[in-house]
């Protein structure tokens, strides 16, 4: 199979009769000085809140690092960026409702601990030059240690991606290659407005 045939097959395999959108948002959790929450603290909060919600708690290497509950999944990224992955919905109202419920759950928890969400693409203290990405500790997930070793040997921007970036990502169902191309063209045009 050629590369072109492989790509074509991959696109064909992704076709769906549904018309859903998925949304993932990574957040920085910082104190008033812009310092990120530590792994031990956020892991304990995930365990506590997950149990209060009767959620299915996810563990990695023995640590609570996320949970799944009705409508969404929470997980930790390499430097404790806090991600919500909202289940796919066909209605933006449902996505908004789930995100509000997530924020209504977590905003008071973090506020009580002296933290708040920052929803920016770059960690503000790094962007301001107050902190170097190399100074930000990684969570103890083994895979992040492997990624870190690779990025340290392969260039200078991997540590920024792992430690000092957060993103929002959407997934869009498509019915055919033509439908996918049409939706990608629209998304490319509006992406500049969303940044």
What are these language model-derived features?
Residues 1-156, 164:
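Terminal catalytic/cofactor-binding subdomain
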Residues 142-195:
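Internal, well-ordered domain-core segments that constitute the primary functional module
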